[in-house]
Amino acid sequence: MIEEDFPTVFHDADDIARRGQRMTFRLSKLRLVSAVVAALGGALSWKLGRFDVWALVALLGFMAALYAEIMLWTRRPERDWTAGRTIAENIKSLAWRFTVGGHPFPASMPLAEARKLFQRRVNEIVARDGAGMTFHSVSRQATTRMAELRTRSLDERRQTYLDERISNQQQWYSDSANQHQQRANRFRALLLTGELIAIVLAAGRGFGVWDVDISGVMAAIVASGAAWLGLRQYEKLRLTYSTAANGLAYVSDQLADVPEDQWANSVLDAEESFRKENTTWMASQPSAA
Protein backbone atom coordinates (compact mmCIF):
# COMPACT_ATOMS: atom_id res chain seq x y z
CA MET A 1 0.00 0.00 0.00
CA ILE A 2 1.13 3.54 -0.77
CA GLU A 3 0.50 4.63 2.84
CA GLU A 4 3.47 2.52 3.92
CA ASP A 5 5.62 4.97 1.92
CA PHE A 6 4.19 8.13 3.45
CA PRO A 7 6.61 10.43 5.37
CA THR A 8 7.88 8.97 8.63
CA VAL A 9 6.29 11.80 10.61
CA PHE A 10 2.91 10.28 9.66
CA HIS A 11 3.94 6.93 11.13
CA ASP A 12 5.34 8.63 14.24
CA ALA A 13 2.04 10.44 14.83
CA ASP A 14 0.12 7.20 14.26
CA ASP A 15 2.32 5.39 16.81
CA ILE A 16 1.83 8.20 19.35
CA ALA A 17 -1.94 7.98 18.90
CA ARG A 18 -1.97 4.20 19.32
CA ARG A 19 0.16 4.35 22.47
CA GLY A 20 -2.02 7.09 23.91
CA GLN A 21 -5.15 5.08 23.17
CA ARG A 22 -3.77 1.93 24.80
CA MET A 23 -2.64 3.81 27.90
CA THR A 24 -5.96 5.66 28.19
CA PHE A 25 -7.96 2.44 28.10
CA ARG A 26 -5.60 0.51 30.38
CA LEU A 27 -5.50 3.18 33.07
CA SER A 28 -9.24 3.81 32.82
CA LYS A 29 -9.91 0.09 33.13
CA LEU A 30 -7.57 -0.12 36.13
CA ARG A 31 -9.36 2.79 37.80
CA LEU A 32 -12.81 1.26 37.31
CA VAL A 33 -11.82 -2.29 38.32
CA SER A 34 -9.99 -0.95 41.38
CA ALA A 35 -13.12 0.89 42.49
CA VAL A 36 -15.07 -2.38 42.33
CA VAL A 37 -12.33 -4.19 44.28
CA ALA A 38 -12.37 -1.45 46.92
CA ALA A 39 -16.15 -1.68 47.21
CA LEU A 40 -15.94 -5.47 47.60
CA GLY A 41 -13.28 -5.16 50.27
CA GLY A 42 -15.38 -2.62 52.13
CA ALA A 43 -18.46 -4.84 52.09
CA LEU A 44 -16.83 -8.00 53.47
CA SER A 45 -14.77 -8.84 56.52
CA TRP A 46 -12.30 -11.63 57.29
CA LYS A 47 -10.18 -11.39 60.41
CA LEU A 48 -6.75 -13.00 60.62
CA GLY A 49 -5.39 -12.06 64.00
CA ARG A 50 -5.52 -8.31 64.23
CA PHE A 51 -5.68 -7.87 60.45
CA ASP A 52 -8.82 -7.67 58.34
CA VAL A 53 -7.96 -9.25 54.99
CA TRP A 54 -10.84 -7.66 53.13
CA ALA A 55 -9.98 -4.25 54.53
CA LEU A 56 -6.49 -4.69 53.09
CA VAL A 57 -8.07 -5.66 49.77
CA ALA A 58 -10.06 -2.42 49.89
CA LEU A 59 -6.86 -0.53 50.67
CA LEU A 60 -5.10 -2.03 47.65
CA GLY A 61 -8.10 -1.20 45.48
CA PHE A 62 -8.06 2.43 46.55
CA MET A 63 -4.29 2.65 46.05
CA ALA A 64 -4.55 1.21 42.54
CA ALA A 65 -7.37 3.61 41.69
CA LEU A 66 -5.29 6.51 43.01
CA TYR A 67 -2.32 5.43 40.90
CA ALA A 68 -4.48 5.26 37.77
CA GLU A 69 -6.00 8.66 38.54
CA ILE A 70 -2.59 10.28 39.02
CA MET A 71 -1.23 8.72 35.82
CA LEU A 72 -4.25 9.88 33.81
CA TRP A 73 -3.87 13.37 35.28
CA THR A 74 -0.12 13.76 34.81
CA ARG A 75 0.51 11.79 31.62
CA ARG A 76 -2.70 12.87 29.84
CA PRO A 77 -2.58 9.91 27.42
CA GLU A 78 -5.92 10.87 25.91
CA ARG A 79 -4.29 14.09 24.70
CA ASP A 80 -1.59 12.13 22.85
CA TRP A 81 -4.30 9.85 21.49
CA THR A 82 -6.48 12.61 20.03
CA ALA A 83 -3.66 14.96 18.97
CA GLY A 84 -1.64 12.13 17.43
CA ARG A 85 -4.66 10.86 15.54
CA THR A 86 -5.47 14.36 14.28
CA ILE A 87 -1.92 14.90 13.02
CA ALA A 88 -1.77 11.47 11.40
CA GLU A 89 -5.11 11.89 9.62
CA ASN A 90 -4.27 15.42 8.42
CA ILE A 91 -0.89 14.31 7.06
CA LYS A 92 -2.50 11.26 5.45
CA SER A 93 -5.00 13.51 3.68
CA LEU A 94 -2.24 15.86 2.57
CA ALA A 95 -0.10 12.97 1.33
CA TRP A 96 -2.93 11.49 -0.70
CA ARG A 97 -3.68 14.86 -2.29
CA PHE A 98 -0.02 15.25 -3.23
CA THR A 99 0.21 11.71 -4.59
CA VAL A 100 -2.83 11.79 -6.87
CA GLY A 101 -2.77 15.49 -7.81
CA GLY A 102 -5.48 16.82 -5.52
CA HIS A 103 -5.76 20.43 -4.38
CA PRO A 104 -3.49 22.24 -3.51
CA PHE A 105 -1.11 20.01 -5.49
CA PRO A 106 -2.67 19.78 -8.99
CA ALA A 107 -0.86 17.61 -11.50
CA SER A 108 0.07 20.74 -13.43
CA MET A 109 2.17 22.04 -10.52
CA PRO A 110 5.93 21.40 -10.97
CA LEU A 111 7.18 18.58 -8.76
CA ALA A 112 9.77 20.72 -6.95
CA GLU A 113 7.15 23.33 -6.10
CA ALA A 114 4.69 20.67 -4.95
CA ARG A 115 7.35 19.10 -2.70
CA LYS A 116 8.10 22.44 -1.03
CA LEU A 117 4.43 23.18 -0.49
CA PHE A 118 3.85 19.70 0.93
CA GLN A 119 6.69 20.04 3.43
CA ARG A 120 5.48 23.49 4.48
CA ARG A 121 1.93 22.20 5.05
CA VAL A 122 3.20 19.24 7.08
CA ASN A 123 5.31 21.57 9.23
CA GLU A 124 2.24 23.73 9.85
CA ILE A 125 0.20 20.71 10.95
CA VAL A 126 2.87 19.52 13.38
CA ALA A 127 3.41 23.04 14.77
CA ARG A 128 -0.34 23.55 15.27
CA ASP A 129 -1.29 20.20 16.81
CA GLY A 130 1.95 18.63 18.02
CA ALA A 131 2.77 20.72 21.10
CA GLY A 132 4.47 18.55 23.73
CA MET A 133 4.78 15.57 21.39
CA THR A 134 8.11 13.94 20.49
CA PHE A 135 8.65 12.71 16.95
CA HIS A 136 11.49 10.26 16.38
CA SER A 137 12.03 11.31 12.79
CA VAL A 138 12.49 14.72 11.20
CA SER A 139 11.58 13.55 7.68
CA ARG A 140 8.54 15.50 6.54
CA GLN A 141 9.13 15.39 2.81
CA ALA A 142 7.14 13.67 0.11
CA THR A 143 8.67 10.26 -0.53
CA THR A 144 10.04 8.92 -3.80
CA ARG A 145 7.06 6.62 -4.36
CA MET A 146 4.61 9.44 -3.73
CA ALA A 147 6.40 11.55 -6.34
CA GLU A 148 6.52 8.64 -8.79
CA LEU A 149 2.78 7.96 -8.53
CA ARG A 150 2.10 11.66 -8.94
CA THR A 151 3.61 11.59 -12.45
CA ARG A 152 1.34 8.82 -13.71
CA SER A 153 -1.73 9.26 -15.89
CA LEU A 154 -5.05 10.40 -14.46
CA ASP A 155 -6.55 6.92 -14.91
CA GLU A 156 -3.72 5.33 -12.91
CA ARG A 157 -3.90 7.96 -10.18
CA ARG A 158 -7.68 7.66 -10.06
CA GLN A 159 -7.56 3.87 -9.73
CA THR A 160 -4.93 4.04 -6.99
CA TYR A 161 -7.00 6.60 -5.09
CA LEU A 162 -10.25 4.68 -5.46
CA ASP A 163 -8.68 1.34 -4.47
CA GLU A 164 -6.26 2.31 -1.72
CA ARG A 165 -7.93 5.37 -0.24
CA ILE A 166 -11.68 5.31 -0.84
CA SER A 167 -12.37 1.55 -0.93
CA ASN A 168 -9.97 0.69 1.89
CA GLN A 169 -11.37 3.42 4.13
CA GLN A 170 -14.94 2.46 3.28
CA GLN A 171 -14.21 -1.15 4.23
CA TRP A 172 -12.58 -0.01 7.48
CA TYR A 173 -15.61 2.13 8.36
CA SER A 174 -17.98 -0.74 7.59
CA ASP A 175 -15.99 -3.29 9.61
CA SER A 176 -15.59 -0.87 12.53
CA ALA A 177 -19.32 -0.11 12.56
CA ASN A 178 -20.12 -3.84 12.76
CA GLN A 179 -17.53 -4.42 15.50
CA HIS A 180 -18.86 -1.55 17.58
CA GLN A 181 -22.41 -2.84 17.16
CA GLN A 182 -21.40 -6.30 18.40
CA ARG A 183 -19.42 -4.91 21.32
CA ALA A 184 -22.25 -2.58 22.31
CA ASN A 185 -24.73 -5.47 22.28
CA ARG A 186 -22.46 -7.71 24.36
CA PHE A 187 -21.73 -5.00 26.89
CA ARG A 188 -25.38 -4.02 27.21
CA ALA A 189 -26.23 -7.66 27.87
CA LEU A 190 -23.57 -7.83 30.59
CA LEU A 191 -24.88 -4.64 32.20
CA LEU A 192 -28.44 -5.96 32.18
CA THR A 193 -27.25 -9.22 33.73
CA GLY A 194 -25.41 -7.31 36.45
CA GLU A 195 -28.46 -5.19 37.21
CA LEU A 196 -30.69 -8.28 37.45
CA ILE A 197 -28.22 -9.96 39.83
CA ALA A 198 -28.17 -6.78 41.93
CA ILE A 199 -31.97 -6.81 42.12
CA VAL A 200 -32.02 -10.46 43.20
CA LEU A 201 -29.37 -9.90 45.88
CA ALA A 202 -31.10 -6.79 47.21
CA ALA A 203 -34.47 -8.58 47.27
CA GLY A 204 -32.96 -11.58 49.05
CA ARG A 205 -31.58 -9.39 51.82
CA GLY A 206 -34.79 -7.36 51.99
CA PHE A 207 -36.88 -10.50 52.55
CA GLY A 208 -34.45 -12.00 55.03
CA VAL A 209 -33.09 -14.77 52.80
CA TRP A 210 -29.50 -13.77 53.69
CA ASP A 211 -27.76 -11.13 55.74
CA VAL A 212 -24.81 -10.29 53.52
CA ASP A 213 -25.14 -6.83 51.95
CA ILE A 214 -23.21 -6.52 48.71
CA SER A 215 -25.65 -4.23 46.96
CA GLY A 216 -22.98 -1.52 47.15
CA VAL A 217 -20.57 -3.80 45.32
CA MET A 218 -23.08 -4.53 42.59
CA ALA A 219 -23.85 -0.83 42.29
CA ALA A 220 -20.12 -0.17 41.84
CA ILE A 221 -19.90 -2.89 39.17
CA VAL A 222 -22.86 -1.51 37.23
CA ALA A 223 -21.58 2.07 37.54
CA SER A 224 -18.12 1.05 36.37
CA GLY A 225 -19.60 -0.83 33.43
CA ALA A 226 -21.67 2.18 32.44
CA ALA A 227 -18.60 4.43 32.73
CA TRP A 228 -16.60 2.07 30.51
CA LEU A 229 -19.40 2.01 27.96
CA GLY A 230 -19.39 5.80 27.98
CA LEU A 231 -15.63 5.91 27.47
CA ARG A 232 -15.67 3.50 24.52
CA GLN A 233 -18.61 5.26 22.82
CA TYR A 234 -19.68 2.11 20.99
CA GLU A 235 -23.11 3.32 19.90
CA LYS A 236 -22.04 6.79 18.81
CA LEU A 237 -19.04 5.51 16.87
CA ARG A 238 -21.12 2.80 15.19
CA LEU A 239 -23.45 5.48 13.85
CA THR A 240 -20.54 7.72 12.81
CA TYR A 241 -18.76 4.93 10.94
CA SER A 242 -21.93 3.68 9.27
CA THR A 243 -22.71 7.17 8.00
CA ALA A 244 -19.14 7.63 6.76
CA ALA A 245 -19.16 4.28 4.93
CA ASN A 246 -22.40 5.14 3.15
CA GLY A 247 -21.07 8.56 2.22
CA LEU A 248 -17.93 7.11 0.64
CA ALA A 249 -20.02 4.98 -1.71
CA TYR A 250 -21.38 8.21 -3.17
CA VAL A 251 -17.88 9.77 -3.30
CA SER A 252 -16.56 6.76 -5.23
CA ASP A 253 -19.27 7.13 -7.86
CA GLN A 254 -18.59 10.85 -8.21
CA LEU A 255 -14.87 10.32 -8.81
CA ALA A 256 -15.30 7.60 -11.43
CA ASP A 257 -15.40 9.89 -14.46
CA VAL A 258 -14.06 13.27 -13.29
CA PRO A 259 -11.79 14.89 -15.94
CA GLU A 260 -8.30 16.21 -15.14
CA ASP A 261 -9.37 19.86 -14.95
CA GLN A 262 -11.85 18.99 -12.15
CA TRP A 263 -9.83 16.23 -10.50
CA ALA A 264 -7.88 18.37 -8.00
CA ASN A 265 -11.01 19.93 -6.50
CA SER A 266 -12.89 16.63 -6.56
CA VAL A 267 -10.13 14.98 -4.51
CA LEU A 268 -10.27 17.91 -2.10
CA ASP A 269 -14.03 17.37 -1.70
CA ALA A 270 -13.46 13.67 -1.04
CA GLU A 271 -10.81 14.43 1.57
CA GLU A 272 -13.19 16.88 3.20
CA SER A 273 -15.51 13.97 3.99
CA PHE A 274 -12.65 12.29 5.88
CA ARG A 275 -11.95 15.51 7.74
CA LYS A 276 -15.59 15.76 8.82
CA GLU A 277 -15.52 12.19 10.12
CA ASN A 278 -12.36 12.90 12.10
CA THR A 279 -13.93 16.06 13.54
CA THR A 280 -16.99 14.06 14.59
CA TRP A 281 -14.74 11.42 16.17
CA MET A 282 -12.82 14.11 18.07
CA ALA A 283 -16.05 15.57 19.43
CA SER A 284 -17.20 12.13 20.58
CA GLN A 285 -14.10 11.44 22.67
CA PRO A 286 -14.75 12.08 26.39
CA SER A 287 -11.90 12.94 28.71
CA ALA A 288 -10.60 9.87 30.50
CA ALA A 289 -9.74 11.95 33.53
Q: Where would I find each of the regions flagged by the language model?
A:
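Conserved non-transmembrane functional hotspots
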Residues: 1-196, 200-289
